[in-house]
Amino acid sequence: MTGEGYKQAIVVRRDLGMGRGKAAAQAAHASCEAVFLILESGRPEWRRWLEMWRLQGQAKVVLRVESLAELQEVYSKAVEEGLPASFVRDAGKTQLEPGTPTAAAVGPAPSRLVDRITGGLKLF
């Protein structure tokens, strides 16, 4: 095992006024979708990152953005950098309209790479 740390950053929109439970559910969706993406990707590097993250306790940080544009920017940067990333749109069954973008996840990946994308964001 290397000394490098691994984590996942989950980014949630605060401008939507979601309740705490709703925001937590959207964060969970983003986290799970990023893991599913890795498992389905066939990318050995991502699979290695996932395993290291799992072995190190699955560190997660939940961060906030204040707009759709900010959420899209985080997701786009992660994809451009070659990191596993998910982008969640709500199903519209409770508080939001169907298709409303709510959250994204970056990683699991080496912490230094995740921080390049999300390091300037505030905690949710």
Swiss-Prot record:
One Pfam family per UniProt: PTH2
Database matches in InterPro entries: Pep_tRNA_hydro_II_dom_sf, Pept_tRNA_hydro_arch, PTH2
Gene Ontology annotations of biological process type: translation
A GO MF label: peptidyl-tRNA hydrolase activity
EC category: hydrolase
Cellular compartments per GO CC: cytosol
Catalytic function, reaction form: an N-acyl-L-alpha-aminoacyl-tRNA + H2O = an N-acyl-L-amino acid + a tRNA + H(+)
Subcellular location: Cytoplasm
PANTHER family, per the entry: PEPTIDYL-TRNA HYDROLASE 2, PEPTIDYL-TRNA HYDROLASE 2, MITOCHONDRIAL
Similarity annotation: Belongs to the PTH2 family.
NCBIfam families listed in its UniProt record: arch_pth2 (TIGR00283), PRK04322.1 (NF003314)
Protein's name according to its UniProt entry: Peptidyl-tRNA hydrolase
